Swiss-Prot record:
Family: Belongs to the globin family.
One GO biological process term: removal of superoxide radicals
Alphabetical keyword list: Cytoplasm, Heme, Iron, Metal-binding, Muscle protein, Oxidoreductase, Oxygen transport, Transport
Protein name per Swiss-Prot or TrEMBL: Myoglobin
The species this protein was found in: Makaira nigricans (Atlantic blue marlin)
Nucleotidyltransferase in keyword set: no
The keyword Metal-binding appears for this protein: yes
Binding residue positions for heme b: 89
Domain Globin as annotated: residue spans: 2-137
Reported function: Monomeric heme protein which primary function is to store oxygen and facilitate its diffusion within muscle tissues. Reversibly binds oxygen through a pentacoordinated heme iron and enables its timely and efficient release as needed during periods of heightened demand. Depending on the oxidative conditions of tissues and cells, and in addition to its ability to bind oxygen, it also has a nitrite reductase activity whereby it regulates the production of bioactive nitric oxide.
Lineage: Eukaryota, Metazoa, Chordata, Craniata, Vertebrata
Disulfide bonds: none
Subcellular localization, as worded in the UniProt entry: Cytoplasm, Sarcoplasm
Chain residues that bind O2: 60
Subunit structure: Monomeric.
Length: 147
């Protein structure tokens, strides 16, 4: 619970501009881990130089961060939020669990740079994301998805 609170203390700047922060997260994810861009068919042909100004990347990044905000505010009571998300990511999008770990690292970097998330906050975010990812993975296993 304390980890969720610590991350939420720094969530305000992210929440104030989901589109900008979401674009930063996805652009960095695609730049640092180019293989992840292939998991998003609608972004597959976008050149690195064009990502920062791409409205679709901003919109999807905003969706990702809004969902993370819901999960943070649930403070661990997130089964009802995770189940449908895990279902769509396993059955429709086929997103391997490793990619949640990659985007978590990127979110930590962006929050450090743009929202002042310090070392203790980064550790708290890592703890929170480890819990969330474990719960997503448990749902994946129930669905028989080994991605």
């Amino acid at each position: 619970m304390a980890d969720f609170e610590m991350v939420l203390k720094h969530w305000g700047p992210v929440e104030a501009d989901y589109a900008t922060h979401g674009n930063l997260v996805l652009t960095r994810l695609f730049t640092e881990h180019p293989e992840t861009q292939k998991l998003f068919p609608k972004f597959a042909g976008i050149a690195k130089a064009d990502m920062a100004g791409n409205a679709a990347i901003s919109a999807h990044g905003a969706t990702v961060l809004k969902k993370l905000g819901e999960l943070l505010k649930a403070k661990g009571s997130h089964a009802a939020i995770i189940k449908p998300m895990a279902n769509s990511h396993a059955t429709k999008h086929k997103i391997p669990i490793k990619n949640f770990e990659l985007i978590s690292e990127v979110i930590g970097k962006v929050m450090h740079e743009k929202a002042g998330l310090d070392a203790a906050g980064q550790k708290a975010l890592k703890n929170v994301m480890t819990t969330i990812i474990a719960d997503i993975e448990a749902n994946y296993k129930e669905l028989g998805f080994t991605g």
